[in-house]
């Protein structure tokens, strides 16, 4: 008697699951730490450049040394501790606060509720547009933002000014608040003595900086056809006159005819005639009675 319906197919179990069950390492292998997966090629590139084992890394190191030498020779004030542009105070540290007089870097973590960050003392008008806030992945989304320094309901914190405190309110989780100040000054501005606090207030035009000296009036040698001395001197007539000298009587030169006897000229016809050494006539008898063979009946 046939069975009603089609039977279920016999599914084969995977060999990997069978091996894990037989060895008993299914639960232990799930907690195995295989290390950090390299996802950023920049770290690998910098590590290869620091090995100094190939030609490219050596060239990169020499280029770094040339750049440092150029900066040290042209801008020695950067390496002094008393300078405002000392770049070491702008380098961030892990979990700390760095910066003086309205400049620097602030970093903080907040667990759950009540995280805060602190920047340098300053006014919000100077660095308000350059301030950037980066929120971590644990911050909530969809809330309405409040004023500066206060947290939105169910969302991220509002934007705080420089020197103020911003608090985050997350629904259970960690969030990082990083405030980065743009304190980069170009070498042109540094050479002109521009203060970082005046960077946002001043608009410097490098072309209009300094007094312009009067250009010397050089003579133009363009392709325009201009005579030397200008058109005024060129319009005058030529004052040079040819000197007068007496011309002698014109004498006709006698015509020299070589081989005046034209009859003695050799003939270059196709008939092989020898050279004529004298004017005596030479007769040639040519038999032109060539018999003509007529056509026969066979042809």
Swiss-Prot record:
The lineage of its organism: Eukaryota, Metazoa, Chordata, Craniata, Vertebrata. Its main location: nucleus. This is Myozenin-1. The keyword ATP-binding does not apply. GO terms for biological process: myofibril assembly; negative regulation of calcineurin-NFAT signaling cascade; negative regulation of skeletal muscle tissue regeneration; negative regulation of transcription by RNA polymerase II; sarcomere organization; skeletal muscle fiber adaptation; skeletal muscle tissue development; wound healing. Residues 1-34, 102-174 are annotated as: Disordered. Keywords: Cell projection, Nucleus, Phosphoprotein. One of its GO terms (cellular component) is pseudopodium. It comes from the Eukaryota. The modification Phosphoserine is found at residue 82. The gene is MYOZ1. It is found in: Nucleus; Cell projection, Pseudopodium. Interacts with ACTN2, ACTN3, FLNA, FLNB, FLNC, LDB3, PPP3CA and TCAP. Interacts via its C-terminal region with MYOT. Residues 112-125, 137-173 have a biased composition (Gly residues). It comes from Homo sapiens (Human). The keyword Phosphoprotein applies. Belongs to the myozenin family. Myozenins may serve as intracellular binding proteins involved in linking Z-disk proteins such as alpha-actinin, gamma-filamin, TCAP/telethonin, LDB3/ZASP and localizing calcineurin signaling to the sarcomere. Plays an important role in the modulation of calcineurin signaling. May play a role in myofibrillogenesis.
């Amino acid at each position: 008697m046939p069975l009603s319906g089609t039977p279920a197919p016999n599914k084969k179990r995977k060999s990997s699951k069978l091996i894990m069950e037989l060895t008993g390492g299914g639960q232990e292998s799930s907690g195995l730490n295989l290390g950090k997966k390299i996802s950023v090629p920049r770290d690998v590139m910098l590590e290869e450049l620091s090995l100094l084992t190939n030609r490219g890394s050596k060239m990169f190191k020499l280029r770094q040394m040339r750049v440092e030498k150029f900066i040290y020779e042209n801008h020695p004030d950067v390496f002094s501790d008393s300078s405002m542009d000392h770049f070491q105070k702008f380098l961030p540290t892990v979990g700390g606060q760095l910066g003086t007089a309205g400049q620097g870097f602030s970093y903080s973590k907040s667990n759950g509720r009540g995280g805060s960050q602190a920047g340098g003392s300053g006014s919000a008008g100077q660095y308000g547009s350059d301030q950037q806030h980066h929120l971590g992945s644990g911050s909530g989304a969809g809330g309405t933002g409040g004023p500066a320094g206060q947290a939105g309901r169910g969302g991220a914190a509002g934007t705080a000014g420089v020197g103020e405190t911003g608090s985050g309110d997350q629904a259970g989780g960690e969030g990082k608040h990083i405030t980065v100040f743009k304190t980069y000054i170009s070498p042109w501005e540094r050479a002109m003595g521009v203060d970082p606090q005046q960077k946002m207030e001043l608009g410097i035009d490098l072309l209009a900086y300094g007094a312009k000296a009067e250009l010397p009036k050089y003579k133009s040698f363009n392709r325009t056809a201009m005579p030397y001395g200008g058109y005024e001197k060129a319009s005058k007539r030529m004052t040079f006159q040819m000197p007068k000298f007496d011309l002698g009587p014109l004498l006709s030169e006698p015509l020299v005819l070589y081989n005046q006897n034209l009859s003695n000229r050799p003939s270059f016809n196709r008939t092989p005639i020898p050279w004529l050494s004298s004017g005596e006539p030479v007769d040639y008898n040519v038999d032109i009675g060539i018999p003509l063979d007529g056509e026969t009946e066979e042809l």
